[in-house]
Structures are given as structure tokens and as C-alpha cells.
Amino acid sequence: MIVRPVTSADLPALIELARSTGTGLTTLPANEQRLQHRVSWAEKAFRGEAERGDADYLFVLEDDAGKVVGISAIAGAVGLREPWYNYRVGLTVSASQELNIHREIPTLFLANDLTGNSELCSLFLHADHRSGLNGKLLSRARFLFIAEFRHLFGDKLIAEMRGMSDEEGRSPFWESLGRHFFKMEFSQADYLTGVGNKAFIAELMPKFPLYTCFLSEEARGVIGRVHPNTEPALAMLKAEGFSYQGYVDIFDAGPAIEAETDKIRAIAESQNLVLAVGTPGDDAEPYLIHNRKREDCRITAAPARAAAGTLVVDPLTAKRLRLSAGASVRAVPLSAQKRG
């Protein structure tokens, strides 16, 4: 498996992936025109022709037969072209000494606080390929790209995680809150956002703080929680240094997690090594390896052995990277458990 930049030839495969995501993955709508537009912008970003606020680095996971089975992306900066909304989960305190009453009420504040940060987004792996190292490669490959081209990204990375919804796409949070203001199904609002029609959010979203005690018990219970299918991705990002700081999605209340870019494990511990081609040996461990290129970027995960400034890999790994012995690579142990 390799992770590489998307190309226009991948559009049919992207449409098929988008159709299988279900609701809740806003940035990957099953809309051919929107996906074609996004691929075009991604190609510009990899060529260095996009401003940071427009840069959308879209990657695909491809097997050795050339089949695209997954997708992930990095947005250079959010909210610089149109407002970026989250709810900040805060606290409102009311008290009366005379009545001996003290109440602390969790409150949702509409916020644009995460504007300007880079974002990890659009992570999706086909169900038939959710095994082995594939998920870790697809998600963590982005960190090596950021480490190699650090100047393209902000000092903080965020990731909006998919919130709770049932098999029919029903979101408890949306049913208790959003539906009253938008008068549409959660799936429709999710789709409109994904195809770039975001003006309705600013026009219809309530601007005043919202006391969560007015929401249903079910809705309150999903604030800051992820969809079960998203739990592995959340655990992976937490292992890299991400944490929840009280921001949630305005539609499904899924958590927006964040980390300082330079403190993310795979970025901070990655290093440039000289590629050696041979037999890694019994003491090899899984490494994430990047060929240090931008437009012709290739990233893979494979057993490797680092020693004395070199990284020993087998011939197939070198072939996947499109490199020969003596080339420079950026590499890091694949899993956070290997740190140190």
C-alpha cells in the first residue's frame, strides 16, 4: 500500500468511496461536480499554486494493483475564506444566596475560535481494507507530509471527529437542536455543507448561548462523543498528542480535537535518513516512510531498521517509494508505542 496525492484519474474511485461513507463525513459528499472541483484544487495545492486558505492536500491509499481504497486530507487553514463554526462547551453559573441556590449549567457558545488552524479531514478507508497497517498508514502519513513541508501549515492542527448518529443517519443532537432552526434532515444539512453551500449556517444558526438543559437527555449524552466507527481514529490521534478542548461540531456535536503541530509525536520524532536497500532483519519494526517529494509524494508503511543515519528497507518498499539506495527519506516508527 502507498499513500499518494490524488489525481483527476482517481475521480471514479472517489465517487464510489463517497457513496459508502454514510452521513457524518461532511467533507466527502457523493457529488461528482464537488469532488471534481476538490480534486482540481488538490492538484493545484500539490503543485504549489494555492494560497494557504485554499490549500486542500487530498491523498489516496492505493494497493499494489493500483486500486484506490481510502482517502485522507489536510486543509492548509480553515475559516479564511468563509466562517468556520463550532460550539464551545462552557459553563454558566447562576446563584442566589437568599434562596441558597447554586446552579452550574453547561452552555453551548457559537464560536469561530479555531479559524486559521490547519485541519486533518476526510479520513475514510473502505471496509474491506480495514486491517493490518492500512488505517495507521492512511491517517499518519499526513504527519510526515506536514513535517517535510512544515511552512505550509499552521502551528495548531485540528480534527473534527464524526459525532453520534444511528444506522438511518439520525443524529440525536440534530433532532434536539438543529432541526428547530434549519427545518431539514441532518443528512441534508450535512450534504449541503459538504458541497460548499455554507451560507445557510450563518443565516439560520442561533447566535445566542444555548443551555444544554433545554436539550433532550439523549442529545446531552452525545455532546463530545464520537461515532463507534470513528473510535479507532480518535484513539490513534490521541496517541499522537491530540486532545479534546471543549469544541464540538454544530450539527452532530462530535468533538473537535487539537494539538500543537510541532508536538505531535510523528512530526516531532520524524528524521531524515539515507535509504539502504537490502534485508531489514529480524529486529526490523514498522516504519512510516516518505520520499520527501511534494507533487510526486509517496508514503508507505513497512518493516525497516534504522541505524547510523540509514534506514534499511526491502526492494519492494524502495520500489513503492520510487527511490533507489542512497536517496534521502523522512521516517518515523509507525506507532506511538514505539516512541523513545
UniProtKB/Swiss-Prot annotation:
PANTHER family: ARGININE N-SUCCINYLTRANSFERASE, N-SUCCINYLARGININE DIHYDROLASE. It catalyses: succinyl-CoA + L-arginine = N(2)-succinyl-L-arginine + CoA + H(+). InterPro entries: Acyl_CoA_acyltransferase, Arg_succinylTrfase_AstA/AruG, Arginine_N-succinylTrfase. Heterotetramer of two alpha and two beta subunits. GO terms for biological process: arginine catabolic process; arginine catabolic process to succinate. Keywords: Acyltransferase, Arginine metabolism, Transferase. It comes from Pseudomonas aeruginosa (strain ATCC 15692 / DSM 22644 / CIP 104116 / JCM 14847 / LMG 12228 / 1C / PRS 101 / PAO1). NCBIfam families: arg_catab_AOST (TIGR03243), arg_catab_AstA (TIGR03244). Belongs to the succinylarginine dihydrolase family. Pathway: Amino-acid degradation; L-arginine degradation via AST pathway; L-glutamate and succinate from L-arginine: step 1/5. This is Arginine N-succinyltransferase subunit beta. One of its GO terms (molecular function) is arginine N-succinyltransferase activity. The keyword Membrane does not apply. Its EC number is 2.3.1.109. It is an enzyme of class 2 (transferase).
